Regions:
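Extracellular/oxidizing-compartment recognition motifs
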Residues: 1-247
Length: 247
């Protein structure tokens, strides 16, 4: 999850390496990737005006190196003349602070996108993106260190030196409540950073909203009518919710 991680992208861009030997077939092959905003574009903190520090859209730089049995190598790189962009898949939005929007009705447009014979309406020519030049700094609090740091040189491509984010443990909800009709709260009794796993049935186009929080409104007079519901005021401007449209 979340590759390539957070760095000051105008200084260092960390790349990931994968062994795809078992995926390469004789004849024509297709190479595809799925992009989200990450730390590159979108929100950079819970203050939503800290936005698009490095670029204004998800971007990708990659290459495939094939080593043949006789030892010679062939390198295939991302190129705006040979690659194509498709923006009508089911992932409509994905961001660290505002969650993900997924429309399952668009999955058929998306199947086999990494196959050589993939065809879909709406394929577009990609653009070469120039990273944003950092000319100003901002501190969250008076006297605090400012960030991002100013540009000093061209970005350096370096191999990832950090362990990837991966699944460590699976938690099951300890309890469930329904403070409002059709609104269910699942309590894990544990602070985690993770991915929810839910099973449900719905009609095509039905919207399912999943929100996340740390505390519930307490039983106090000032919270009359809200007791037992999820409190998200401490999340500041981050919406912190996922939206799923059934197919």
């Amino acid at each position: 999850y979340f590759a390539p991680g957070a760095s000051q992208y105008d200084r260092h861009l960390m790349y990931q390496t994968y062994d795809v030997t078992e995926l390469v077939q004789e004849g024509e092959n297709g190479l595809g990737c799925i992009l989200a905003s990450g730390w590159w574009s979108d929100s950079f903190s819970f203050r939503l005006y800290n936005y698009n520090y490095w670029g204004d859209r998800p971007s990708f730089l990659g290459r495939l190196v094939i080593t043949y049995e006789d030892g010679h190598k062939e390198t295939i790189v991302t190129d705006d003349n040979t690659w194509q962009y498709f923006g009508e898949g089911p992932y409509r939005y994905a961001g660290f602070f505002n969650g993900e929007t997924y429309d399952a009705r668009l999955e058929e447009n998306y199947f086999n996108f990494s196959k050589s014979d993939f065809k879909a309406d709406g394929l577009k020519k990609p653009e070469v993106i120039t990273p944003v030049v950092m000319e100003e700094q901002e501190g969250i609090f008076p006297g605090a260190a400012c960030w991002p740091a100013m540009n000093e040189k061209e970005p350096e491509l370096v191999g990832s030196y950090q362990a990837p984010v991966h699944e460590v443990e699976t938690f099951t909800a300890k309890s469930m409540t329904e403070p409002l009709p059709g609104t269910y709260i699942y309590d894990l009794e544990q602070e985690i950073a993770g991915v929810p796993v839910l099973k449900f049935k719905g009609k095509a186009g039905q919207k399912i909203t999943i929100r996340y929080g740390e505390v519930l409104y307490p039983d106090l007079p000032e919270y009359k009518g809200l007791v037992g519901q999820m409190l998200q005021a401490n999340l500041r401007e981050a919406s912190n919710e996922d939206t799923y449209y059934c197919k």
